């Protein structure tokens, strides 16, 4: 039986402001707050909310039959928290249906997987934590930025404990093979690979409203007929795209949402189901490995990383940024970490591309690739100065890591000692309380025949309940222990 894996990416660009050379060293805030607020509210109104409402309607109408997956970048979630929290609330409502899966991805939507394994792992783990906080479940399948993948990256992902990964079904990688099977990483068979069907995905995300396209207009029944016509043994149809395709790339006036709403019933009529990535990874066996020695992605015709690293400007900016990756990770300064996440976002390098593209590229405030490069390098110059100012630059990374590890261990040891002190203080006060209680009872037993003498002892007993005061003093210490 054929099954469709429908997945949407949600990522929001954090726009950098115009930053001059003379701002270096004086201005440490790099972001265009007005543009960030304007752009995310526009995309939420035109795309995210209408699309998510449509997907919710599809789930409610079709029950457990219809399923969908999402991934959100950490920086995208931060922008949504600030400017469009209703999007996250809607995603939580969708999550409550039990028909939605959330995938892992790098926190920054950056390119760390290409150059720094430790930074890549740290980003993925932080994003998993954030997803779990919002949606109550830790991701088991990973989707890298722009579906970037290679054998080495796949091996790293498998070693992190993920069972599956999404990537591009590029022709130059697959050759005669079909993307409609489950494959596995060539270096680590534990990691299953789900490959995007390029044509079926782009029919919706890129061509749907193009009246010059041979397949225009595209109807849901014809779309499902294409899927049903695949050979019986081709069971997995992976349709991956950005959520902004529904409403931005393909305007709502094109009836894109009506098309989407019709898909579940058309699939059901043809015996085609919907599954989440983890369900497919658990239920369907791999038919073999896919060899990807060189990095691929879902961007541009080449399906590689040349959109971010294709010219000298991009490579210079990339190498300079990641030259301080280990130092940033070791220092672990909150403000530095936040700026690090935003500066890593792959969009910053995409704005510098000189490649022609079939997909329009909005460079925002930048008039040219060189303009984007100059502005970014000014910001990066200030950022690296701040990183180096945290600790002396003559201390190398190994020495710094050793020093900070020692400090961290000492802090943990002090914390343990503090907890032990609180515990012992509480124990001492408990012993004192019991001793005073026993002491208060002794006068009553000493003169049983003389009732008059016994009375003062009885009256004094309440006055001797000093432990009540001590108990109130002990309570803050008990709280400190917790």
Language-model regions, residue ranges each:
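Intrinsically disordered, polybasic Lys/Arg-rich low-complexity tracts
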Residues: 426, 430-482
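Generic structural signal for well-ordered alpha-helices
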Residues: 52-56, 88-92, 121-131, 154, ...
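Short, well-structured secondary-structure segments
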Residues: 3-8, 14-116, 140-143, 163-168, ...
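Acidic, His- and aromatic-enriched active-site or binding-groove loops in soluble protein domains
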Residues: 87-104, 125, 137, 158-179, ...
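Loop-rich catalytic cores of soluble enzymes, especially ATP-dependent carboxylate-amine ligases
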Residues: 163-229
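An acidic- and aromatic-residue-enriched active-site/binding cleft used to recognize and process polar
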Residues: 9-13, 73-75, 107-110, 136, ...
């Amino acid at each position: 039986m054929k099954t469709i894996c429908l997945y949407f990416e949600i990522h929001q660009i954090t726009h950098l402001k115009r930053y001059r050379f003379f701002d270096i060293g004086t201005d440490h805030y790099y972001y265009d707050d007005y543009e960030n607020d304007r752009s995310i509210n526009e995309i939420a109104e035109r795309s995210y909310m209408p699309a998510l409402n449509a997907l919710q309607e599809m789930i409610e109408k079709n029950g457990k039959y219809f399923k969908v997956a999402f991934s959100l970048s950490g920086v995208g979630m931060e922008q949504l928290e600030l400017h469009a929290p209703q999007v996250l609330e809607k995603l939580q409502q969708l999550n409550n249906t039990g028909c939605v899966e959330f995938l892992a991805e790098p926190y920054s939507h950056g390119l760390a997987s290409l150059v720094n394994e430790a930074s890549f792992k740290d980003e993925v783990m932080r994003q998993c934590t954030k997803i779990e906080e919002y949606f109550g479940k830790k991701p088991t399948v990973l989707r890298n930025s722009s579906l970037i993948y290679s054998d080495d990256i796949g091996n790293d992902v498998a070693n992190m404990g993920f069972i599956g990964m999404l990537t591009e079904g590029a022709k130059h990688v697959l050759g005669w093979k079909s993307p409609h099977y489950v494959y596995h990483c060539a270096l680590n068979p534990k990691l299953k690979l789900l490959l995007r069907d390029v044509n079926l995905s782009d029919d919706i995300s890129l061509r749907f409203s193009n009246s010059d396209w041979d397949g225009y207009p595209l109807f849901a029944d014809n779309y499902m007929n294409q899927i049903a016509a695949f050979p019986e043994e081709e069971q997995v149809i992976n349709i991956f795209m950005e959520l902004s395709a529904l409403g931005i790339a393909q305007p709502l006036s094109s009836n894109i949402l009506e098309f989407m709403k019709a898909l579940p019933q058309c699939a059901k009529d043809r015996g085609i189901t919907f599954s989440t990535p983890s369900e497919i990874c658990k239920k369907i066996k791999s038919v073999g490995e896919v060899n990807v020695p060189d990095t691929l992605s879902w961007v541009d015709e080449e399906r590689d990383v040349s959109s971010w690293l294709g010219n000298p400007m991009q490579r210079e900016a990339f190498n300079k940024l990641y030259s301080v990756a280990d130092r940033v990770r070791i220092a672990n300064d909150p403000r530095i970490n936040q700026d690090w996440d935003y500066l890593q976002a792959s969009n910053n390098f995409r704005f510098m591309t000189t490649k022609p593209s079939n997909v329009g590229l909005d460079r925002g405030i930048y008039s040219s690739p060189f303009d984007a490069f100059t502005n970014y390098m000014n910001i990066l110059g200030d950022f690296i100065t701040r990183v180096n100012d945290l600790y002396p630059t003559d201390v190398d990374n190994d020495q710094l890591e050793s020093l900070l590890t020692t400090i961290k261990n000492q802090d943990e040891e002090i914390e343990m000692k503090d907890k032990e002190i609180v515990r012992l203080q509480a124990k001492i006060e408990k012993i004192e309380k019991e001793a005073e209680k026993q002491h208060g009872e002794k006068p009553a037993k000493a003169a049983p025949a003389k009732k008059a003498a016994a009375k003062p002892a009885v009256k004094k007993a309440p006055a001797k309940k000093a432990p009540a005061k001590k108990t109130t003093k002990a309570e803050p210490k008990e709280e400190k222990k917790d």
